[in-house]
Amino acid sequence: ETVYDPGNGQADGSLIEDFIEGGNVSLNTADYIYYVTLGGGSNGENGLKTITDSNFDLWTDGNVATPTADGAKYTPSLAEYTSNRSLKRDQVEADDNWEYVGVFAEGAGGTDPAIIQNVNDQGMVGVVMQVSDDTLPRGAVITEIFNNWLPAMFTTTAVEAEGKATSTWAALKADR
């Protein structure tokens, strides 16, 4: 099975699109996100465009990505490297449906690793070291994103129960 059929045959409602639109996170590493599918079928650059309903392309060969302040804070294994498939800042910022929520490295050509979020459904798409180079510490960087950055994004806030509807209702019932 695949989360997205080859040939961009599912303009809407694919497993991966529904997963993202359900408020989940999809990360990719090594090369162009959603480009190739099960059995080597090719979606090309339109895979990303179709799944995110955007005009994003990742053709950024030779983008020297330098860790940002967040990169240093959350992904200490990340060092400067050359990315070939970075998210382009101008494209993301021009799209009303997507915004950056995490930029761990950036160069003149774009951002990678980086995570963007759909402002309508809160789903996230991220690229992590998208270049054909097996010497890069991809596993360490992705692990650090999961262990250090994601928990910071999904913090819980304590709610003071006093005066809330359930507390008030309980007090009213107790007084009867």
Predicted feature residues:
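Short amphipathic alpha-helical segments and helix-helix/interface helices
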Residues: 13-20, 89, 146-150
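Short, structured coil/loop segments at alpha-helix boundaries
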Residues: 8-9, 13-16, 62-83, 138-143, ...
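Structural recognition of the beta-strand scaffold that forms the well-ordered cores
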Residues: 1, 25-29, 102, 124-129
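Helical hinge/lid and interdomain linker segments adjacent to catalytic or ligand-binding clefts
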Residues: 1-45
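Intrinsically disordered, low-complexity segments enriched in polar/charged residues with Gly/Pro
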Residues: 3-5, 101-104, 158-159
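An acidic, glycine-rich "communication" segment
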Residues: 28-121
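Extracellular ligand-binding/catalytic regions of CAZymes and related secreted enzymes
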Residues: 43-54, 109-112, 117-176
